[in-house]
């Protein structure tokens, strides 16, 4: 019997997949528990419509992320920090401080999305990558100046 999985079922199939399973398994377990529905033509049309709307939604999210990327890349953040000789900072500029500076500019970014390997420990310009979307990464210029 062909069924369309409504949820992931370990070892059998993932959500949205169409598979052949034994009739007893489908009628006695999958369908009553809401894990799958019978693959009728109406259900197949619904599945295709859902897939199309999901693809469209993903495409819109990608376009929004690319637009946000250009906005972020146009920015140059200026952060002030106390420094000693040779431009070395007392302390460091962390992702939290960069996220706060971005929010002051009106750009909301989660600090966990800022891909800074090590905190910034010197004066000057640093390019900081920010992951906006799984496929889109923006690079923001951070200018650290002496306080």
From Swiss-Prot:
UniProt entry tagged with the keyword NADP: no
> GO CC terms on record?
ribonucleoprotein complex; ribosome
According to the UniProt entry, its GO molecular function terms are:
rRNA binding; structural constituent of ribosome
**What's the protein called, per UniProt?**
Large ribosomal subunit protein bL9
| Keywords per UniProt | Ribonucleoprotein, Ribosomal protein, RNA-binding, rRNA-binding
Question: What task does this protein carry out?
Answer: Binds to the 23S rRNA.
Its source organism is: Halalkalibacterium halodurans (strain ATCC BAA-125 / DSM 18197 / FERM 7344 / JCM 9153 / C-125)
Give the superkingdom in one word. Bacteria
- State the Gene Ontology BP annotations: translation
- Please spell out the taxonomic lineage of the organism that makes this protein: Bacteria, Bacillati, Bacillota, Bacilli, Bacillales
Chain's gene name? rplI
């Amino acid at each position: 019997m062909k069924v369309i999985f409504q949820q992931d079922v370990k070892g059998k199939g993932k959500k949205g997949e169409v598979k052949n399973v034994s009739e007893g398994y489908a009628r006695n377990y999958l369908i009553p528990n809401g894990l799958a529905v019978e693959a009728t033509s109406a259900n197949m049309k619904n599945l295709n419509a859902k897939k199309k709307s999901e693809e469209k939604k993903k495409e819109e999210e990608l376009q929004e992320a690319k637009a946000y990327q250009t906005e972020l890349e146009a920015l140059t953040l200026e952060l002030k920090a106390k420094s000693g000789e040779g431009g070395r900072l007392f302390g460091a500029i962390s992702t939290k401080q960069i996220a706060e500076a971005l929010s002051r500019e009106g750009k909301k970014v989660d600090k966990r999305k800022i891909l800074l390997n090590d905190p910034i420990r010197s004066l000057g310009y640093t390019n900081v990558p920010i992951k906006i979307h799984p496929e889109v990464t923006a690079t923001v210029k951070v200018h650290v100046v002496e306080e």
